[in-house]
Regions:
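Short, flexible active-site loop motifs that bind/organize anionic cofactors or intermediates
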Residues: 15, 23, 41, 66, ...
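Sparse recognition of residues in long alpha-helices and their boundaries
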Residues: 17, 48-49, 153
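Short, acidic loop-to-helix structural element flanking the phosphoryl-transfer center
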Residues: 22, 37-67
């Protein structure tokens, strides 16, 4: 959010000092996470079609499955457990939070996952939902499938070879 506000403009009522702005952005992130978690817990933000089946088939064949997100680790773990159930969640490795110095489109989080799971990046398949994630996966040397959503379809279809419409 800081980068966005610095690039566009800080809201008129936003704090003026760097320290106050840092606290302001942290409070926005916290509130966003609370609202997002409420949507997940109420099942108002379900998995995209086909995701659960894909995960089940991968796990059933012994494929290593990971979730890579620069969001808060606690929130990501809760989301995975809530949407996929605790049995699946315990079989999925989560890379989240500030485990890498740079966020997507930098490939660091994907490369960390591949290294940790001892998998060659070229044999990884990433399922993403954005151009930023697609760029990160490609920069890591990984194949990428982008799922369609209302907020990304028009831009993503021009940048990738595989768009999943389910």
């Amino acid at each position: 959010m800081t980068a966005y506000f610095n690039k566009t403009e800080w809201p008129a009522k936003a704090p003026k000092t760097d320290e106050e702005r840092k606290e302001f952005v942290a409070s926005l992130h916290k509130r966003k996470t609370e609202l997002f978690m409420a949507l997940i817990e109420k099942k108002l933000l379900p998995l995209r079609p086909g995701v659960q089946r894909l995960i089940d088939e991968a796990l059933g064949k012994g494929v290593k499955v990971a979730v890579c997100s620069t969001s808060n680790e606690k929130a990501v773990s809760a989301i995975v457990s809530c949407l996929l159930g605790p049995d699946r969640a315990e079989k999925i490795t989560i890379f989240a939070g500030d485990v890498v110095p740079r966020k997507k489109p930098d490939p660091a989080i994907y490369l960390l996952a591949a290294t940790t799971l001892e998998v060659d990046p070229s044999s990884c398949v990433v399922v993403e939902d954005s151009n930023i994630g697609l760029s990160a996966a490609k920069a890591a040397g990984m194949k990428c499938i982008v799922t369609k959503s209302g907020y990304n379809f028009l831009s993503v279809k021009y940048f990738c070879m595989i768009v999943v419409v389910s």
